[in-house]
Amino acid sequence: MKISLTFILSVLIIFVSSCATTTSNKKYLEDSNNKSKYFVLNQINKSSNKDLANALSKLYELKKLNESEKNLLVVSLKNGDIKRSYANEIEKFLKHSQKINSSVLKLNIGTSEKNKEMLVQSLLKENILFSISFNNDNFFEINDDVFASNLKFYCQSFIEEQNNKLENMLLRNEKILIVYSSDYEYEANALMLNNSEHEYLKINDSDYENKLQNILEINNSFNKAELISSFDKNSKIQHTPRLRQDLKKIYFLIGYNEGKSVVPFLKSFTTDLQLFSSTRIFHEADSLNDLADFENLSIPVSKNFIAKAENNNFNNLKGKFENLLLDDYINIEKAYQNNIFNSKIILNTGLTQINRGACVNRNLSFWNIDINSIVDQS
């Protein structure tokens, strides 16, 4: 059989185009996850050192600088290691830093014992003057579940922002499969009301294998392979199942008990499916190493946020994440109480800007989980 040159070129073009798209998407995700890093490095001339970048990061994180870090920033402003176009902003932040560390941060909060302990530990770690009350009237309430709290300055909770990011991306284009468990049935039913064109599948620990194989038509593919094999008992056919072609993306509304089994199960059949979830799918995991089960799952949270969780001593990842969110709340309180507005600051969730009277936007970005990159980073 002769294969035409046109056919070969067509295949090559498709292959190269696919590789280019994958590379482009990967670079976009990397750039999105390094906004804070680029924000800092863009202000420094190439001759500058790592210590300067670290000191500048701490300045924009509203963290307390030691004398050595302050002196380094002042000297770098004079000798040109910091770009002239950023000098005024950095000088302004040095004044903000001095004010933050000479004034008392005042907090009046109503919340659970768990959150009280985290807040006090975070404030002690900040090494600043503070006054915190949990009993006075007119307190600001933080839900026991920090993920479900808007934390005073946000219009939405962290989990609401994640869900909105996922739904805006996934529900408006081609048909997708939404896999949910009984814990998230209410949310799945709410999605069905306005998004009935998508496929929905309820699963549990014991039935997910059969249900997923049926809806993705994996069983049909295996049955055809067995039929072909039956014609020649002596032949051994290597078979890779062909999945439904109209479902390329799966959105999970499940917890860790289901997720740690379901995601690896699907990946064992194909790498072509794009898998999405909020961070809830691994909240109950013990450590970042457990994310190996979720390799290449796309989540609407930056790699940097996830990597920071390894440094916190809590029983599971949810506790680590909640601690990071409360740290962000404290930093925004610092900004408000010291009139730091209309300037970019670096939070655990990423680069953001505080505008007086306006909701703070976390500017979430997607990350395809890569366990090696966060273990190396942490």
Question: Which role fits each region the language model picked out?
Answer:
Residues 2-10, 19-378:
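Extracytosolic ligand-binding ectodomains
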